[in-house]
Amino acid sequence: MEAYKKEFIEFMVDCQVLKFGDFVTKSGRKTPFFVNTGFYRTGAQLRRLGQYYAEAINNKFGLGFDVLFGPAYKGIPLSVAATIAISEKYGQDIRYCSNRKEVKDHGDKGILLGSPINDGDKVVIIEDVTTAGTSIEETLPIIKAQGDVNPIGLVVSVDRMERGKGTKLSLIHI
């Protein structure tokens, strides 16, 4: 395991984002740990979180993409923190985008926040926790509805590696 991943786990514990005990996930499964990224509450924590994500994104995808998409709600601050960190650390000005849970019917209207997603854009999705892959399955149609775009991958802080439909891991299923 890379050093930054070990440091990230310690960071989650220090921020009380990662807790150990007896919990039940949204999918109804019992688990000995729980992750709540809503416990990142300060500017310093979000800056450091963005740096971890920036390193993971660069290691996995490089910087050859256009938009970092954070699904509502918890993906919104993740996408903002990571794009700031990418700009500071790598000098790349990546755009961020996220969605609203409900379409706005006044003002600027629409479902997207941040940058629009344009034809030809390569998009990386950023998430906090993946259990069954449900939020990603909901996110892909939103991204693809924006035009001829290419979702190239996903970066997630915690993949519970639970099984999806059949015997496939949830992220492989997607």
Residue positions per predicted region:
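PRPP-associated nucleotide enzymes
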Residues: 1-126, 131-172
